């Protein structure tokens, strides 16, 4: 699961630690039940059979038949690298085998400031997530200034800085011990010992369409440098090992393919690079941020790519999706003009999520149905239109969509209703999973993450361009009208909304505009929640 450009969101992720309020004692070693997601920004997903892993703090969703007790649908991994440090999960991969526990890999990142994500190492589990082993990052030592490729010893840039080298994507080979990480500026790296050590994988430079270890080269290995050296094709955002054992790597200069027959006796790989161009059989853009495989029973599995317009290479690059039905022999462009973040597939259906919502195709991308309104189960509400879809995955039981406002689940039996022309016209109903932080918590729930307040706003600080909306949470003893008002620092009214709300904990959203729809300036804002003759107050720090 790739996370290109997610550093901007990383620094804004509000992470809750449900269940840790009473954790004055050491954290347990095993998966522990939790009441909600760790964050409402869900950017990484990894299916594992019926179950689903999600970031940013390794939450596992279990279907009813797999739950330790009926109410325990969500479990949280108790990994100190996440619960006691500033790391979040930036890349996820879960590998399942019949009659064996899932193997789970998590690439970690932390904020290095200035909207930059930094490499934080890895977590690896071989027992279905019950326990995780911590692994160091995949970076170079200062003396790693050469790399052997075939008969050549190539000069290399030692990538020693954690910043801009956060794991973007993970792929695991069929043996379960070999893994590849798409490491942004650190390139493509390989581990053959479950992440205990990593080695650099040599990819073609921007000037070559293919390389082979049978030939000799002299190009420098490394990302672009300020003095002009380095290559965009050595900046890697996505990777995949498909059913045939072919390794794919999406970079800033196209898509790289290495088949099983391309591997030499020393493990060095021949590569072919595919790039963008105006021709129909080329990629829409050179920046490949996601790679997904479509399982088929009647043909070779197609490969789907989220391809973005890049800063180099051929002119006329576009955002969109590119697919190959035959392992790279030919390519086809679809969804041209759409900025797509993630892809998933189940049999004939392909799912893509992007800035404009969820896209579904059942005819290999010839036509698409777009879904940007998500009606919620058991409710008359839909997700706010400002919410962005960020990730997508399929399990054997459901379709999952990660958003900037929670995790959506749709029963597999309801997927057909997503398609235009479906015989059953009612729109499908989604289940929404979100972070659960109580208002007026009990004493044993109170902590730094769960303050004892009557109302709160999150995310706070609120960055409208990044967060899209802020939620003001409060609790009602009985159903009735609620008025939420926002004031500026001089206590001048900026915005107000009145709506009828049911009893219990509720939320009202604000998008950072005034009553005229104009964006408000950076500053401190105060809000009031008025209901049933009572008023509670709070504060929001807004920055543009």
What are these regions (language model features)?
Residues 7-19:
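Bacterial N-terminal signal peptides
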Residues 24-32, 58-81, 119-140, 189-201, ...:
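Asp-box/BNR beta-propeller loop motif
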Residues 25-48, 72-97, 109-116, 139-174, ...:
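Short coil-to-beta transitions that initiate beta-strands within beta-rich domains
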Residues 51-54, 103-105, 178-180, 189, ...:
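Conserved beta-propeller blade signature
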Residues 443-444, 457-460, 472-474, 491, ...:
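Terminal processing/anchoring signals of secreted or surface-associated proteins
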Residues 446-485:
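Glycine-centered coil/turn sites that cap beta-strands in beta-rich domains
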Residues 472, 490-520, 531-536:
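Glycine-centered tight-turn motifs at strand-turn-strand junctions
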Residues 524-544:
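C-terminal tail/sorting-segment detector
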């Amino acid at each position: 699961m790739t996370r290109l450009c997610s550093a901007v969101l990383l620094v804004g992720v509000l992470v809750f630690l449900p269940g840790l309020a009473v954790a004055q004692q050491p954290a347990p070693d095993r998966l522990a039940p939790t009441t909600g997601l760790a964050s409402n920004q869900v950017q990484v997903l990894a299916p594992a059979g019926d179950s689903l892993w999600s970031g940013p703090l390794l939450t596992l969703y279990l279907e009813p038949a797999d739950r330790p007790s009926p109410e325990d649908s969500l479990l949280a991994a108790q990994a100190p690298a996440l619960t006691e440090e500033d790391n979040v999960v930036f890349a996820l991969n879960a590998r399942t085998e019949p009659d064996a526990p899932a193997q789970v890999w998590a690439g970690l990142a932390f904020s290095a400031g200035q909207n930059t994500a930094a490499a934080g190492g890895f977590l690896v589990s071989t027992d279905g997530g019950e326990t995780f082993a911590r692994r160091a990052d995949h970076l170079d030592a200062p003396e790693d200034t050469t790399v052997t490729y075939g008969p050549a010893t190539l000069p290399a840039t030692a990538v020693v800085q954690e910043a801009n080298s956060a794991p973007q994507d993970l792929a695991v080979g069929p043996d379960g011990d070999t893994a590849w990480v798409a490491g942004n500026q650190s390139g493509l790296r390989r581990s053959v010992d479950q992440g205990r050590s990593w080695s650099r994988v040599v990819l073609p430079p921007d000037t070559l369409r293919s390389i082979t270890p049978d030939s000799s080269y002299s190009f420098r290995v490394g990302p672009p440098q300020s003095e002009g050296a380095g290559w965009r094709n050595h900046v890697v955002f996505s990777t995949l090992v498909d059913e045939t054992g072919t390794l794919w790597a999406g970079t800033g200069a196209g898509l790289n393919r290495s088949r099983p027959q391309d591997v030499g006796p020393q493990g060095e790989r021949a590569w072919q690079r595919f790039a963008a161009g105006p021709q129909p059989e080329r990629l829409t853009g050179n920046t490949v941020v996601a790679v997904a495989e479509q399982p088929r029973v009647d043909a070779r599995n197609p490969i789907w790519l989220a391809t973005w317009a890049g800063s180099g290479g051929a002119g006329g690059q576009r955002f969109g999706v590119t697919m190959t039905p035959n392992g790279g022999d030919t390519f086809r462009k679809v969804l041209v003009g759409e900025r797509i973040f993630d892809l998933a597939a189940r049999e004939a259906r392909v799912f893509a999520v992007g800035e404009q919502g969820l896209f579904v195709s059942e005819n290999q991308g010839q036509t698409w149905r777009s879904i940007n309104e998500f009606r919620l189960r058991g409710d008359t509400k839909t997700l706010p239109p400002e919410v962005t879809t960020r990730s997508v995955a399929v399990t054997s039981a459901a379709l999952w969509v990660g958003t900037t406002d929670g995790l959506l689940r749709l029963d597999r039996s309801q997927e057909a209703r997503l398609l235009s022309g479906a015989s059953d016209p009612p729109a499908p109903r989604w289940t929404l999973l979100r972070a659960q932080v109580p208002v007026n918590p009990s004493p044993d729930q109170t902590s730094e993450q769960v303050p004892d307040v009557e109302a709160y706003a999150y995310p706070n600080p609120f960055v409208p361009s990044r967060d899209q909306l802020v939620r003001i949470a409060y609790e009602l003893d009985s159903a009735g009208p609620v008025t939420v008002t926002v004031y500026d620092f001089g206590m001048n009214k900026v915005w107000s909304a009145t709506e009828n709300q049911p009893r219990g904990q509720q939320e009202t959203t604000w998008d950072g505009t005034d009553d005229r729809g104009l964006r408000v300036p950076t500053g401190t804002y105060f809000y009031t929640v008025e209901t049933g003759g009572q008023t509670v107050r709070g504060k929001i720090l807004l920055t543009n």
